[in-house]
Amino acid sequence: MGVAVLENGSLLYHGVETFRKLPSPQDRLKQGRAAVARLIRDFRPAVLVVEKTFIGKNRNAALLNVLGDEIAALGRRHGIAVVSLAPNTVKKAVAGYGWATKAEVANAIAARYPELKAYLPPGRKWKQQRHYNMFDAVALGVACLNASKSRGPHNSHCQIRAP
């Protein structure tokens, strides 16, 4: 799971939360909830941005859908505004068009935040890297910030205040 914390356009934290493969989906969800609760406690965000999930036909996709819903619910329980953005919306905001590849999104993010260039994979080895989740998380934050700038401070929940 990619994680990014932005404040006023500055990248304060970025990373990937990894979870052990546990036999039970409930145990994996519990791990995810615990990680998100820890991040909320550590960073105290004003806004939590999650990617809109898709309807998948396999067990992993279903688990991701449930985890996305759990993350949003956990944020609301902590009084945090929750914004859900579709992948194409994020890609358009970051890379200029909605059908951008993960590599194109990552390159656009690395151009904005040069400290992330070290995480760009060489050549075509993109799917072998775990960092694409981190780039996705930063892209979600950037898309949310861009939306708040275009709508004005009073018309968007994507305002990032002190974490």
Where are these regions (language model features)?
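Phosphate- and other anionic-substrate recognition elements at nucleic-acid/protein interfaces
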Residues: M1-P163
